């Protein structure tokens, strides 16, 4: 390749990389896999190695991430947020070690301590504390400037808002992520994220922080900017002491074989971890050596990321079917010829949405590249159009719901398309009924998935109203329930008793039970406390058809939630279902408090078994009293409530000087000052 050709190819690669950086970092919507992106970068680096004179005019090679999104305020990083160079094989790691020793004037026979950490597949962020209080949080952005996400980050559970004994100024950096199980539930609840990383990034970069607050975001911190610690190992321990979440899977070793075994261990067992990782990060452990090694404009010389290879394979799309979730989102699914990917037989893959099918032009009969994204959810990443038969036609996305025929709706600036049939749509019904009887809704004990499926298949429960006429239907039918396997007189009696007991329900739980898109437990509670009675709430929901802006006066209710409520209450099927449902129910008014409890605004944690109620009931009572209930202790915990046989949290609370309450004392704290109307 001549230099002129190399320059043209370099410009082309830079343009492609810049485009995909924007999609990944700013839009949270990557269109190629990590492996494909790495190939582009590798090609660019090969050209620069062969033609170093082109490097001086190749400004884009120094970029990190992408330009901050204009919808967020810009934040200048005091210390540039660098990305890491990648290694793709064992030889790259060996070269990294050799090069590091050479730069440190070490003999190659000398050992060097390396910190080995998991590479979390999430969103990099920085948090600055001033005099122990959160002052600012930001994304990486382009490395020089990030996006101000302070209010969004404050909603992340277990992130300290206040740090005791902190220096006047402290900057920590880490990775925001979401567990795979929470990601799956998020998509079941009406979202359509491609993978957990996109879900985490999209959740953090919401203009409406109430949406961020509803997402179960987590984080790990991995560094302190300008740390006074002597080693990376010491830095991680210091972060723990300050109350931050730090990943437990780390080792420090002088042996390269141990470092590579660490990689192999997690590559082979990463599906056993609850969150996505996409490699291992190796860092020189000694901080002084890190300073000596320094950094290029893009990445530190003292660290490298050893990426996991993508698990991909090619197979045939036999059919494209449409799956309808609980909240009505239509998700296209590729029905595949069985293929082994990473030891797992894959027969179906997500196509995400209509836009994704159109962009990739995926057709029934195509040969496609399938990747197990995050080792869990297979997705189609590309089409081999060289193998496409001429007679294959474009896939036509349905214009009405394939299940119930209701209208489809697509919100502005959203890729998800969903059915407006809600409580009428057959494909949504079973999932909605499961949600309806769940613990935070009607809490009908003994109504598990198997029982629901049985009654559904028998035609006895085809909508949520049928639950409350089930006993009458069975008594008037030829079905002898007690004679069937798994049913006895006691279990039947308990089920019908649970159904009858659930007929009195709080307004908050009733609203949540309806399973309206974007109306989770938190929003249901806000709506209930605002309208107080069912009659008032229902009347105001009907107003949405004429005027949806009035709901904006309710703090923490955003445009997406309002529009979702409007779509629900303008569908006559849903109104008919609600009106039939309330005939069987007593919906109690929301409770108001005229005095604050002693726990109002406090963070509490429970340990041990409670004598008077379940942990779930205790959590509900505490939250009603204004407390925040956490599952883990930190310096930000105000009280530990101790039941019988307390666990290790009891000793930890003592060491952190956290106030300890007995169950009886806790009951006094939430009761005496609370006056319920």
Curated annotation (Swiss-Prot):
Q: What is its EC number?
A: 6.5.1.2
Q: Please provide the Gene Ontology terms (biological process) for this protein.
A: DNA repair; DNA replication
Catalysed transformations (reactions) = NAD(+) + (deoxyribonucleotide)n-3'-hydroxyl + 5'-phospho-(deoxyribonucleotide)m = (deoxyribonucleotide)n+m + AMP + beta-nicotinamide D-nucleotide
Statement: the UniProt record of this protein carries the keyword Zinc:
yes
Every copy of the BRCT domain together lies at 594-677
SUPFAM superfamilies, per database record: BRCT domain (SSF52113), DNA ligase/mRNA capping enzyme, catalytic domain (SSF56091), Nucleic acid-binding proteins (SSF50249), RuvA domain 2-like (SSF47781)
Say which enzyme class the record assigns. ligase
The entry lists its GO molecular-function terms as: DNA ligase (NAD+) activity; metal ion binding
Q: Which GO terms describe its cellular component?
A: cytosol
Which keywords, in A-to-Z order, does the entry hold? DNA damage, DNA repair, DNA replication, Ligase, Magnesium, Manganese, Metal-binding, NAD, Zinc
Q: Which InterPro entries match?
A: BRCT_dom, BRCT_dom_sf, DisA/LigA_HHH, DNA_ligase, DNAligase_adenylation, DNAligase_N, NA-bd_OB-fold, NAD_DNA_ligase_OB
PROSITE patterns in the record: BRCT
Q: Which residues form the active site?
A: 119
Kindly give the PANTHER family that the UniProt entry links to this protein: CHROMOSOME TRANSMISSION FIDELITY FACTOR 18, DNA LIGASE
Membership in a protein family: Belongs to the NAD-dependent DNA ligase family. LigA subfamily.
- The protein depicted here goes by the name DNA ligase
